[in-house]
């Protein structure tokens, strides 16, 4: 069975400065993200052992651990792709039109996304996703890595609001981190995810 692996980044750790420091990116990627990858692989191995023993309590525990760590791995993998030293500005084309249609304007979308990010209680994410059932863009606050994000939503743009993503640079002023994020958003990546979600996920939920 193939194991989960830590992806390489498309840019050097310091490439997003001054908006996100190289120190943060190095720790975030090589330590925190790596921990979720290891946690997911460990949970899979323990889940196999528990199934072999028909230990249902252990099965449920390791399914829970797998959900947390695998979601952490998936979210961070998208996070790194959502960022670019050549990012910033605004989306264009079909994504820009869809954002304007769903939220009224890019500025209104940005305000709602910013509010979702900066009011997360505890650890979590802000997420822009494509609703494969309702065929529309939606914003969610994600608690931890996986809670409050409905099945059938394809993530397009994520903002990591765990303290490990910003504290070394921004301390407790997470609002400033959420503002700086817009300077490094890789809209080309978000557009690519939007195009794939809208063209390849029809019928994903109900067939």
Swiss-Prot record:
Residues annotated for Fe cation binding in this entry: 28, 76, 160, 164
GO MF, one annotated term: metal ion binding
PROSITE patterns for this protein: SOD_MN
Matching InterPro entries: Fe/Mn_Superoxide_Dismutase (IPR050265), Mn/Fe_SOD (IPR001189), Mn/Fe_SOD_BS (IPR019833), Mn/Fe_SOD_C (IPR019832), Mn/Fe_SOD_N (IPR019831), Mn/Fe_SOD_N_sf (IPR036324), SOD_C_sf (IPR036314)
Broad EC category: oxidoreductase
Signal sequence interval, chain numbering: none
Main location group: secreted
Entry note: cofactor: Binds 1 Fe cation per subunit.
Necessary cofactors: Fe cation
Pfam families xref list: Sod_Fe_C, Sod_Fe_N
Keywords, ordered alphabetically: Iron, Metal-binding, Oxidoreductase, Secreted
Domain of life from the UniProt record: Bacteria
Compartmental location: Secreted
One GO cellular component term: extracellular region
EC number(s) per entry: 1.15.1.1
This protein's record includes keyword Nucleotide-binding: no
Catalytic activity from the UniProt record: 2 superoxide + 2 H(+) = H2O2 + O2
Entry's family note: Belongs to the iron/manganese superoxide dismutase family.
Job of this protein: Destroys superoxide anion radicals which are normally produced within the cells and which are toxic to biological systems.
Quaternary structure and partners: Homotetramer.
Protein's recorded name: Superoxide dismutase [Fe]
Source lineage: Bacteria, Bacillati, Actinomycetota, Actinomycetes, Mycobacteriales
């Amino acid at each position: 069975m193939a194991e989960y692996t830590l992806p390489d980044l498309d840019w050097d750790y310091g490439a997003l400065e001054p908006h996100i420091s190289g120190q943060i990116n190095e720790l975030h990627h090589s330590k925190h993200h790596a921990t979720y990858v290891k946690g997911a692989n460990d949970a899979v191995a323990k889940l196999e052992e528990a199934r072999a023993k028909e230990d249902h309590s252990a099965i449920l525990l390791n399914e829970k651990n797998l959900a947390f760590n695998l979601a952490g791995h998936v979210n961070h993998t998208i996070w790194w792709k959502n960022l670019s030293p050549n990012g910033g500005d605004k989306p264009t084309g079909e994504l820009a039109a869809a954002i304007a249609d769903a939220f009224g304007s890019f500025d209104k979308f940005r305000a709602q996304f910013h509010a979702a990010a900066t009011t997360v209680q505890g650890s979590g994410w802000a997420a822009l996703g494509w609703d494969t059932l309702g065929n529309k863009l939606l914003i969610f606050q994600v608690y931890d890595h996986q809670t409050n994000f409905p099945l059938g939503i394809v993530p397009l743009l994520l903002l990591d609001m765990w303290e490990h993503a910003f504290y070394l640079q921004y301390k407790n002023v997470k609002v400033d981190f959420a503002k700086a994020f817009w300077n490094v958003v890789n809209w080309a990546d978000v557009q690519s995810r939007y195009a794939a979600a809208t063209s390849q996920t029809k019928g994903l939920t109900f067939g």
